[in-house]
Amino acid sequence: LRKAGILMPITSLPSPYGIGTMGEAAREFVRFLHKAGQSYWQILPICPTSYGDSPYQSFSSYAGNPYMIDLDELSEAGLLEKDEYKNIDWGSNPEKADYGLLYNRRFGVLRKAAKTAEEKYQTELTEFRKENHKWLSDYALFMAIKDEQNGVSWLEWPEILRKRDNKALAVEREKLKDEIKFWECVQFLFFTQWKKLKAYANENGIKIIGDIPIYVSSDSADVWANPEQFQLDDNLMPISVAGCPPDGFSADGQLWGNPLFNWKVMKEQDYNWWVDRIAYQTQIYDMLRIDHFRGFDAYYSIPYGDKTARNGEWKEGPGIDLFNVIKEKLGELPIIAEDLGFLTDSVRKLLKDTGFPGMKVLEFAFDSRDTESGYLPHLYPKNCVVYAGTHDNETILGWFDTISEEDAEYAKKYMRLSEAEGYHWGMMRTAWASVADTAIMQMQDILGLGKNARMNTPSTLSDKNWSWRCLPGVYNDTLADVLHQEMKLYGRI
């Protein structure tokens, strides 16, 4: 079935409280998607962010981001008084999230709400703690110790805490019991709102596509609580880390720095870590986009401590074996494979064997440096998801500002672009008209925004990354009607 959707991070929704949340603006966006003839709302990972504000580098691959908790909803539930958050300065720029300011001001408000919630929702909290015990107790303990240790990475904690000495952890649990309760309660508040939002989306015929990074952050509860699943030495320091090799776009490659999986141990344990992770994510989302899918076929391993990715080497991943086990235990999986980047025949075979749809990015189709491009629409298989660009790319208008004249001419000719229609509409039209079963556009492109609205520039640390926000009133009925007509025209409703 031909469908379409919009990529819009929750943090990018309009809000008077500094960042997009799961409140009324999110429900308004769901209604907009429904009116616009869309079937999917794709979001970025909803995990807590850490240094650099990237949702792909999180303290936990299970937890929800406290910043996304809607304060008005907490107030309506009787957990906050309006004057406890309305008069706080959440930042002066409605088009940008200020993470530093949020870090300093949001938690004080959440502490007040959590205190009331502990009394008001005792039964529900007990149930939530029981249901999520597998990850929640480690995460809450991790965050409580982290605060006690002034926020430093767990790799710098005292050895007895790093190596999870049972006696030492028992002492911490007793000493930090109120803090642990707070971090657990914040997750309860997050997932209470999340379930409500997802149910609302589903009732309106909208499915949510979640995004899960293949790797987890080294400074995370995941690695601290499960060190045997990763390539760590006896001192729990990474042996090798993840990244991408040098190519025509980057002489040094990309050094991501995430610890690599110990696939040997994972296989011996029947991939339970992965089965648990995917099972959990499929409860939260309707579909999953798995980032860096090629890493399951072969992964790039860079010696820990290197400053660039030049000295890395390819090593064999688990391949189809992992997906066979997951499928056997969980059934058919609604997964989109992010298969961008350096692809080999064996990656293509793995994708084919799983049956997952891969991704096509239109912005990659017209690059004269890449003559092997499979990104031109006349080469697409039906079983794929086409994007004009993703969160890691320029917006369409930003892209036209950065590409060579030759590439721009090729793109204009191929897609029959005109200034009268607007290059962004012409490019999106090309994607919607393609044979790809699913077409997802960034909200920034639907709004015709330029390079200032780019979500992320990979391998850079900047307050421009992850901070774009949408102004109130921009997703309206007029825009929804235009999109609805396009969907009808190209058979996507």
Enumerate the predicted regions with their spans:
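N-terminal regions that are enriched for targeting/export leaders
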Residues: 1-11, 27
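Alpha-amylase-like alpha-glycosidases and glucanotransferases acting on alpha-linked glucans and related
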Residues: 9, 15, 53-187, 191, ...
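Conserved, well-ordered alpha-helix/loop/beta-strand core segments that scaffold catalytic motifs
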Residues: 183-184, 188-216
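Catalytic domains of carbohydrate-active enzymes, especially glycoside hydrolases
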Residues: 24-49, 284-285
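Surface-exposed amphipathic alpha-helices with a cationic face
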Residues: 34, 194-204, 327, 351-352
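Outer-envelope exported proteins of Gram-negative bacteria
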Residues: 44, 207-209, 213, 287, ...
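C-terminal accessory segments of extracellular proteins
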Residues: 478-493
